Amino acid sequence: MGHAWYGNWMFWTLSGSGLAVVLIALGFWAWLRVTAVQRGVTGTLRNISDRLVRDVILPDGIGGFVPVDALVLRGRQLFVLDIRDVEGAIFGAEKMDIWTAMGRKRRYQFDNPIRPMHDRVTAVKLLAPGCDTAARILFTSRGHFPKGRPDGVQLLEEFAQPLLRAKQKGPVSIPDDLQSVWNGICEAANVLPGRERPERISRS
């Protein structure tokens, strides 16, 4: 009886190890599921961009700042992007203060995303006066617009389709004048060369 299962250290060690492996696998699967949309967005933006920064704060030229989800340089075109992952049927118009999304489990409302884009585009134009700048509000494929949508509002896949290309092995070469403009944008956004997101400001 000295080797009964409840007194067998090897049994408990193997059982504990097996349980740990299962929990780690479940946690990893959950992480993959939760971040799938985010990783898909990131991959798409990297594919279509000659240069890319994300989650930046830019000076607005009058002493304030504006947030920008993503700024994509492609050729001589700069796209100022507001990216939203909203599930369900989306109802919105340019003159509506509040937009609504009807998902499977809940009804979700959010402010009209078009109105803040003017200030964001203006801020980018101040930093890149020689570039053609356009605003786009992009929704992931989890959302759809059963009653139409305003100009400048697209699904991410629709926006990206004409810009998709074979995967690049390294940074895309761009003219020196564009690189200088881009460096100025990155400096204003506190993004180091070769990075996509701003540096965290340390608190002393």
Feature annotation, model-predicted:
Residues 1-66, 73-78, 87, 98, ...:
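Surface-exposed interaction regions that form or flank ligand-binding interfaces
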Residues 90:
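Polar interaction faces of repeat-based domains
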